[in-house]
């Protein structure tokens, strides 16, 4: 692969610099520069703070014994005279103060025309593999191979499948041109000093639990080179040419390589599954619940293929004395940017090998499953393989829910949005709620978090020295890089501050150039262009409609966007789109200023908040729902609530010390006292002990 970027030059304010040789200014002695004085002041403050923390913070305690201040709603209030608990605070239910209600008219079409007949056993304790029978009134809701939910009707130019056009009838501007004009070389090297890089792989891992739509077979196998799209004597425009992303001749990156088009593969529509629906409808291949289906599989055949059928454990193999997912000889992803990968993992998610961070977490949870299965079997020797497996699978799904709602989402959305959208407190199951993933979420709002993907991933050794730096594009389709680097990659995510929130993606995921194998030419990859095009592919409404849907004032002119978008960006939008009503949703979502302590703007928070409320309230098996055949006991729920990602990482790796709040950036050099020995991170399984 050829990239147009050097290694990150730390003297630059930009994350990445193009290959342009610029003469360096004559350097002054460093002790005469203002930053050196500032550095000395900060160093003195840091040392003083460290000494205070070291003296007063518990150093040998357990993360489970720290007395954190609890939210007011969960606080137990005592009367000095009677010493009784105030009943007002006895139980706090998750209730949103803001709810968006779907305006779409097509959500029921699949269930009327194509849904299979399903027979359910209401007394089943465990989830089905494909997600059916979660909702007993609507057994197909949220199941694999059912459509994404829509909050608003799809918008296609022909009402069926062709890309939306502008109000004046002109095509929408090229996704690549939009990205270049708004964001090119505007990525700033700025770190999030509160959070580490672990937010990125967890977000990707979570996405693969709830979403998977395969490529349309009509153009998934077409050649990467698209020169034939410019042949003028064609009587019919090839399918792949209609959806390709146009690149301007003066493109600052691809112009010099004569790259004029990006290949774009559309999502596979329902008609490919013998269900012709209008407008174009996309089926989700994964279950639409947070249930660890990406670990275990979304159908019984896949799930059975991953099992040993002994002691409830999953198949694995040992490589370099470490446990990894089994080999998948039928993997579709064998050639990455660094060459062929002989390692191809098998997991519940078909895309396990797509991204090294996803492969890391798949292997992490494989190991944790097998650890828990061993412990549960010891606790209950009489249990069958099936019972140990199902109970462990049930616990793993609950753990992913706890980590997501208690630790991940509060950072992404902030406390105010968490409360506003009903994402805190005890879950009350509501069978009238369809938990299915919104198309506006998977093709729009959640993709906006690609703006925190860093320019590089660090691999760190046990003594915290960086042994390798890799660009995100290098870890695509290269699962072999994980072997021998498992712990190093985890340390790198933990010990590297995250990318600060900013509208632009980093340049190393928007300007990738690679040589086309066996051809005299180049092609490229731009994640932002693909995200914009994916929204058009799946018929997302434009930004103005989405913000109005979320309760914001509808803009009549571009300047009406100034409540959330900077005037500079508004001027650029004017040069790109015909009217304010034409702006792509993801563009508006990226440009919105974050509010209320969140990492996203209000229209993004609205869609993310709605989706995760429905994942929670519409899931009969959600971990803290009571009164169902599959409900955990109160003691089991209490044990699950104490778990963090640190428990999983400590048990499933060779790391020795971890902070309790795993996503928070804790520099080992200055804050080692709040990194606890991994022996402290143990899930209390005693509530699962069965007494005969």
Language-model features, listed with the residues they occupy:
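Intrinsically disordered, low-complexity cytosolic terminal tails
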Residues: 1-19
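N-terminal accessory/cap region of cofactor-dependent oxidoreductases and related radical enzymes
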Residues: 17-371, 375, 394-529, 533, ...
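Secondary-structure edge/capping motif, primarily at the C-terminal ends of alpha-helices
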Residues: 376-380
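Mobile, glycine-rich extracellular loop/lid and propeptide segments
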Residues: 385-388
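Hydrophobic, mid-to-C-terminal alpha-helical segments
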Residues: 556-559
